[in-house]
């Protein structure tokens, strides 16, 4: 979509439920001016380098390194930039997508993006800023998970599975999309009628009603960012396992 010396933006997956894009920002690169979305959540997961987020009525500056997650639910003022001296790479999520892809292509001027309201919008406490150290941890015999975000429109969990895990059998979700960004692998995914091996950096999406499952494709541990949009009660079921 965009590939210039100072920045690269690639859309990895585009569904009604969410759109996921991969960003590369060189030092000094900035996102849009502070803004709000009235009807959807704007979220970020840092892959490499450091991203500075400005959140809330006072534009509190928070710096995020790899593994950290930030989210601005509806009506939380936010923006972002690379304020460091090295390259930053990160994922950006709009949940639901609401035509964000076409907005980035210059074809949706009515997209849900607005100037900050006079009252500054919702408080900073409504935003999400999660580090691996303060994330909720869920541990099981063959797996461990970090809950990065649990909002009405999105659940985001960093999942790690050790060798010996038997995998997740093919299944469906009727009410939400189940998506994966592979961090460590390889991972074998079954989606619809296809089975493919996904290496780190691969995005996999199972829209509502699509059969999907996964398992190890090698002897190494596997790790991925798992996104449920909307949540569909997934985290509650996971906590009960």
Show which residues each predicted segment covers.
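Short, conserved beta-strand element in jelly-roll/cupin
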Residues: 24-25, 36-53, 93-95, 160-162, ...
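Short beta-strand His + acidic residue motifs that chelate non-heme Fe in jelly-roll/DSBH
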Residues: 32-34, 53-54, 62, 72, ...
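Structural motif
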Residues: 43, 50-52, 77, 87, ...
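Short acidic-glycine-tyrosine-enriched beta hairpin
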Residues: 58-74, 193-208
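Double-stranded beta-helix
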Residues: 81-134, 213-241
């Amino acid at each position: 979509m965009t590939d210039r010396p100072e920045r690269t933006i690639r859309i990895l997956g585009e569904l009604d439920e969410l759109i996921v894009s991969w960003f590369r920002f060189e030092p000094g690169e900035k996102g849009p001016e502070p803004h709000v979305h009235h009807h959807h959540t704007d979220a970020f997961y840092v892959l490499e380098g450091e991203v500075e987020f400005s959140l809330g009525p006072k534009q509190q500056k928070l710096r995020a390194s790899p593994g950290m997650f930030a989210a601005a639910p509806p009506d939380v003022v936010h923006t972002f930039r690379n304020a460091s001296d090295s390259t930053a790479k990160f994922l950006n999520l709009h949940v639901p997508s609401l035509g964000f892809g076409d907005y980035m292509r210059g074809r949706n001027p009515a997209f849900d993006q607005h100037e900050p309201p006079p009252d500054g919008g919702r408080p900073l406490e409504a935003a999400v800023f999660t580090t691996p150290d303060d994330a909720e941890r869920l541990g099981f015999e063959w797996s461990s998970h970090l809950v990065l975000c649990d909002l009405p429109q999105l659940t985001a969990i960093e999942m790690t599975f050790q060798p010996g895990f038997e995998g997740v059998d093919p299944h469906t979700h009727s009410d939400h999309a189940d998506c994966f960004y592979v961090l460590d692998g390889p991972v074998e995914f079954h989606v619809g009628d296809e089975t493919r091996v996904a290496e780190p950096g691969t995005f996999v999406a199972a829209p509502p009603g699509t059969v999907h499952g996964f398992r190890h494709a090698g002897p190494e541990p596997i790790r991925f960012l798992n996104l449920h949009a909307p949540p569909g009660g997934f985290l509650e079921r996971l906590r009960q396992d």
